[in-house]
A protein has these predicted regions:
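Short alpha-helical transmembrane segments in multi-pass integral membrane proteins
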Residues: 1-24, 78-145, 189-246, 302-369, ...
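N-terminal transmembrane alpha-helices
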Residues: 8-40, 44-45, 61-73, 105-109, ...
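Transmembrane helical elements of multi-pass membrane transporters/channels
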Residues: 19-35, 141, 175, 204-208, ...
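Helix-terminus/linker motif at the lipid-water interface of multi-pass membrane proteins
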Residues: 29-51, 120-129, 185-192, 253-286, ...
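Small-residue hotspots at the loop-to-helix junctions and early N-terminal turns
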Residues: 47-58, 135, 139, 198, ...
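Small-residue-rich hydrophobic transmembrane alpha-helices
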Residues: 50-110, 149-168, 274-340, 373-395
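Hydrophobic transmembrane alpha-helices of multi-pass small-molecule transporters
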Residues: 62-65, 179-183, 209-213, 286-289, ...
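Short runs within selected transmembrane alpha-helices of multi-pass transporters and secretion channels
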Residues: 71, 141-160, 168-176, 197-212, ...
């Protein structure tokens, strides 16, 4: 790949960017809806059920983030090969990310299915018997869905690498329709409670997986896998994918392990605190959907620019994407402050104590997100698109453990503070991440990395 920066015509016009990012916003909203729908509809069973589902979902996020990190590695490599006009290598990288994803997700599903009780006890310690019963039920079926989530994430990432985000959006739409419809039938119709929610999620993820794989095999797909023999390991491509995927996986994994460590603190504060934390977490995820979507799309835009050797365009698009992320974040979080928070919380069957806790958390979240969220989470994806994953990993891991986990344990165990201070630790982590990522971006060293 050439290192020269050129000033040729723009690689992406306005219509192409809109066509990429609008479906991504919809896809992210739909993706988050699965966890939110489960929590919302399970709330009719009671706070113990909500708490059980939320504890498992915190672990599920860890697994999904690890799988997504590997998909990110594949997307970055494929994007840069597309930008560099090497279609055969791009297709080969698609086959290798599928090989990696299938292997890892199947092994993970088996381990978690067999050891789910020990995992829950090890992470969350002593929790109410009802909460544990619900959690074990939800955990088993969640684990069975990991291979389908993994393959779906890989397929969706490959479509986005081509600049086609409509496929993953439509697949996510189908997944959510099946999930919500299944929840309604199994929870309300058959009274299956948590088991019904978990079953609906499993079936919906299976359908999304098969849909993406079918579309990936169409003749007009630039990254299709033509033969099963294409899945034969290619050590050179695996190394290139893992160069981005492993640091991203360690970053996401350690980030989620840190969150799990903090969740174990939350579980000591009582069922109301667990429920408030779960509901506020789900709602807050929705508020950052636009900025999150921009970060995902940045892997395609910045990756293709750098693959084509267009460093000037890469930096220009990066600034535009970051400003877009801030605009979306301000729109959503100001709406939350003025009316969305109370409206969303009213949908959940929370006790007055849990409702009050959740509302307080949301107000703080809105205020801090306006300043810190895009620079903490959208900006590092821009750096990863250039292959600068080792830097983002180092900053994220150190910041998580030093500023979030240590702070939370100190405030809760030493000073006996409540749930709000656990979220304060999260905000402190964001501030540190933002500082280092912004400095890295301004100095431009992130564009000196070599992926292909």
């Amino acid at each position: 790949m050439t290192d020269a920066s050129t000033t040729s015509r723009p690689l992406f016009n306005r219509q192409q960017l809109i066509s990429l990012f609008l479906p991504l916003v919809a896809e992210q909203a739909l993706s988050i809806s699965i966890g939110l729908a489960d929590t919302l509809m399970v709330s009719s069973v009671g706070e113990a059920a909500v708490s059980g589902v939320s504890l498992v979902d915190s672990f599920n996020v860890l697994m999904i983030q690890l799988l997504s990190a590997l998909a990110t590695g594949g997307a970055v490599v494929a994007s840069q090969y597309i930008g560099h006009r090497e279609p055969k290598r791009a297709k080969a990288s698609a086959a290798q990310i599928m090989f990696i994803m299938i292997s890892l997700s199947v092994v993970t599903a088996v381990i978690v299915s067999v050891g789910r009780h020990a995992i829950l006890r090890g992470i969350f310690g002593s929790i109410d018997a009802d909460v544990m019963r619900y959690a074990e039920t939800y955990f088993l079926l969640s684990a069975l869905s990991y291979p389908f989530i993994g393959v779906y994430n890989a397929g969706a990432a490959l479509f986005r690498a081509q600049g086609n985000s409509k496929i993953s959006m439509l697949s996510s739409l189908v997944m959510n329709v099946v999930n919500i419809g299944g929840n309604a039938i199994l929870i309300y119709g058959f009274g299956m409670g948590v088991m019904g929610a978990a079953t609906a999620s499993l079936v919906s993820r299976m359908i999304a997986c098969f849909t993406v794989m079918f579309l990936l095999q169409k003749p007009d797909c630039a990254l299709r896998i033509d033969h099963l023999t294409d899945l034969k390991p290619d050590l050179d491509l695996i190394k290139r994918i893992l160069k981005v995927g492993i640091p991203a996986g360690i970053e996401n994994g350690m980030f989620q392990i840190g969150k799990l460590s903090v969740s174990s603190l939350t579980s000591t504060l009582g069922t109301a605190a667990i429920a408030a934390n779960a509901v506020a977490g789900n709602i807050s995820s929705f508020l950052n959907v636009p900025a999150s979507a921009v970060g995902i799309g940045a892997l395609t835009v910045v990756g293709q620019c750098l693959g084509a050797g267009e460093k000037v365009q890469a930096k220009r698009y990066s600034r535009l994407l970051l400003l877009t992320a801030y605009a979306g974040d301000w729109l959503m979080n100001l709406s939350g402050l003025f009316f969305l928070n109370k409206l969303a919380l009213s949908w959940f069957n929370l006790s007055p104590e849990a409702y009050g806790m959740a509302l307080e958390l949301m107000v703080w979240f809105n205020a801090v997100s306006l300043i810190l969220w895009p620079s903490s989470f959208t900006l590092p994806n821009i750096l990863r698109a250039a292959g600068d994953a080792a830097f983002t990993m180092t900053v994220s891991v150190i910041s998580m453990w030093v500023f979030r986990v240590a702070f939370c344990y100190l405030m809760v165990l030493k000073f006996h503070c409540g749930l709000l201070f656990i979220w304060m630790g999260m905000f402190l982590d964001w501030a540190m991440r933002s500082l280092f990522f912004c400095v890295r971006f301004v100095r431009g060293r992130w564009m000196e990395q070599k992926v292909i």
